[in-house]
């Protein structure tokens, strides 16, 4: 909800988990709202999910290096208590402006690899050699461009946030990361 800065309501999330629940997906920073959960919120989520050992957790961290206002990304990889059921997805497309190159990666526990393979065979094809070489160069190269892009995205975020909130009957939550704005035009 906008009034909660689009943060996960942990109490509600836990109340919805039942014997059929197999996976919880966390997208941080969030698409489409741009909301960002800081470490304290992630700590609470992990603590609440420890009670459900049969529920896998998928952490979509594709925007992990596009965090505004000097905050740090609390990757779920830093929580040993859930590592045996944690899936982390990330990639090059957002950080290195390689959208469309379809180059990403995932970290899966060995117990979930067979399930991942069943999904992957129907979901995607191999990344081209050009994409793979470009990805290697992006990682090896200077990260100054990433900082420059982040600064530009933050300036754009500020501009769109202020502009939308200056409009009559429009409000907009201030995104904490990614490159999305989620204006409320329902007034």
Model feature map: region roles:
Residues 1-187:
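PLP-dependent class I/II
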């Amino acid at each position: 909800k906008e009034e909660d800065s689009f943060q996960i309501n942990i109490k509600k999330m836990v109340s919805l988990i039942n014997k059929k629940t197999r996976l919880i997906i966390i997208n941080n920073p969030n698409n489409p709202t741009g909301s960002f959960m800081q470490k304290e919120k992630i700590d609470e989520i992990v603590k609440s999910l420890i009670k459900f050992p049969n529920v896998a957790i998928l952490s979509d961290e594709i925007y992990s290096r596009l965090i505004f206002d000097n905050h740090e990304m609390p990757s779920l990889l830093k929580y040993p208590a859930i590592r045996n059921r944690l899936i982390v997805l990330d990639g090059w497309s957002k950080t290195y402006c390689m959208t469309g190159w379809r180059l990403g990666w995932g970290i899966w526990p060995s117990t979930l690899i067979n399930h991942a393979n069943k999904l992957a065979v129907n979901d995607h094809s191999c990344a081209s050699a050009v994409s793979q070489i470009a990805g290697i160069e992006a990682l090896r190269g200077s990260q100054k461009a990433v900082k420059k892009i982040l600064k530009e995205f933050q300036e754009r975020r500020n501009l769109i946030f202020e502009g939308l909130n200056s409009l009559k009957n429009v409000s907009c939550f201030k995104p904490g990361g990614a490159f999305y704005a989620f204006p409320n035009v329902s007034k």
